[in-house]
């Protein structure tokens, strides 16, 4: 038995010498037992994700119909990372990012790294270089459907390019997944929806880019508009449902409902009010909302406005919600140290 133990110890030392410290270990000896996360910027989504935000070092896919709020969800994650002193990058393959809207959502556009690549290969190579630097906390690729292979761009309009994009995504994710995990970068891929032709039974909807992204994603979010929010006769936003379709770090299939207000993004006050009402932290009597025997307002929109004008009350309610769900605020953003980066295998630097 001792000979086997000695042989195993020698093998482990050899592996660590060749591939770096931490390349193999016993599961219980891992330095970080708890999943390290960064808040999504939406309280309801943090709760639905089960761990208080997006897990670091993982691939996230956000998909849904057009104008459902996919890019808004991703921009809120960028704003949250920047608020905590982290670095973010946005690969704009659709060439459609609105800097004015991003700024309104809290994104520091002066610090945001932006690339508008010409081809899918270029986009993914830029993403790979940024991830391997070890200095990026979140990178957003918008969108997978717009990652057009070079052969398709250089070819004629009517040419058939079957499976090219799927092959590109499969190859890219094989290379990226290890580097994403080592560098603790959150990679958010935004995706569109297509319909499969001739499907008689079941859901005909599918996402472009093949199956690879579905497999490599630790979290998949489906974003859909539920209803239009009105103030009088004016349409002011959308109530949006975000369903956690896949989750490798917590139980899946939870759902978050958020208000996406036009020109403002996800309403923090709306999420606080809805969740606090469910937990009876905020009491609702008829149309009136009250907290600590103080009336917040008559009707949901008035109560939201009160919380916007009184951030102290909103903070107190939010802290009680986080305490109830065991979400102890945002987790600090830290880039890998020079020592950690030196430990990476050469092919992951």
Swiss-Prot record:
InterPro entries: AAA+_ATPase, DNA_recomb/repair_RecA, DNA_recomb/repair_RecA_CS, P-loop_NTPase, RecA-like_C, RecA-like_N, RecA_ATP-bd, RecA_C_sf. ATP binds at residues 64-71. CDD domains: RecA. It is found in: Cytoplasm. GO terms for molecular function: ATP binding; ATP hydrolysis activity; ATP-dependent DNA damage sensor activity; damaged DNA binding; single-stranded DNA binding. Pfam families: RecA, RecA_C. The keyword Cell membrane does not apply. One of its GO terms (cellular component) is cytosol. HAMAP family: RecA. Can catalyze the hydrolysis of ATP in the presence of single-stranded DNA, the ATP-dependent uptake of single-stranded DNA by duplex DNA, and the ATP-dependent hybridization of homologous single-stranded DNAs. It interacts with LexA causing its activation and leading to its autocatalytic cleavage. This is Protein RecA.
């Amino acid at each position: 038995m001792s000979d086997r133990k000695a042989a195993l110890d020698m093998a482990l030392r050899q592996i660590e010498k060749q591939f770096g410290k931490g390349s193999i270990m016993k599961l219980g000896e891992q330095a970080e037992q708890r999943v390290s996360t960064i808040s999504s910027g939406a309280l309801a989504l943090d709760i639905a994700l089960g761990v208080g935000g997006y897990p670091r070092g993982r691939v996230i896919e956000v998909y849904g119909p057009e104008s459902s709020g996919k890019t808004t969800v991703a921009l809120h994650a960028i704003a949250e990372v920047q608020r905590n002193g982290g670095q973010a990058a946005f690969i704009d393959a659709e060439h459609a990012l609105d800097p004015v809207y991003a700024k309104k959502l809290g994104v520091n556009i002066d610090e945001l790294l932006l690339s508008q690549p010409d081809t899918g290969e270029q986009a993914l190579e830029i993403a790979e270089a940024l991830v391997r630097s070890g200095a990026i906390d979140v990178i957003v690729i918008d969108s997978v459907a717009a990652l057009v292979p070079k052969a398709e761009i250089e070819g004629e309009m009517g040419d058939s390019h079957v499976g090219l994009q799927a092959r590109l995504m499969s190859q890219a994710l094989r290379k990226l997944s290890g580097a994403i995990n080592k560098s603790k970068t959150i990679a958010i891929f935004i995706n569109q929806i297509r319909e499969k032709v001739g499907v008689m039974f079941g859901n005909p909807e599918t996402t472009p880019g093949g199956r690879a992204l579905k497999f490599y994603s630790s979290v998949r979010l489906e974003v859909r508009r539920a209803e239009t929010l009105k103030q009088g006769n004016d349409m002011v936003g959308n109530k949006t449902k975000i369903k956690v379709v896949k989750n490798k770090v917590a139980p899946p299939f939870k759902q978050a409902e958020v208000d996406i207000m036009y020109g403002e993004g996800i309403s923090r006050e709306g999420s606080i009010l809805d969740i606090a009402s469910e937990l009876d932290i905020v009491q609702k009597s008829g149309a009136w909302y009250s907290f600590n025997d103080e009336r917040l307002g008559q009707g949901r929109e008035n109560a939201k406005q009160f919380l916007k004008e009184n951030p102290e009350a909103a903070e107190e309610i939010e802290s009680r919600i986080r305490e109830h769900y065991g979400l102890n605020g945002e987790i600090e953003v830290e880039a890998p140290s020079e020592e950690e980066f030196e430990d990476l295998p050469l092919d992951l630097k």
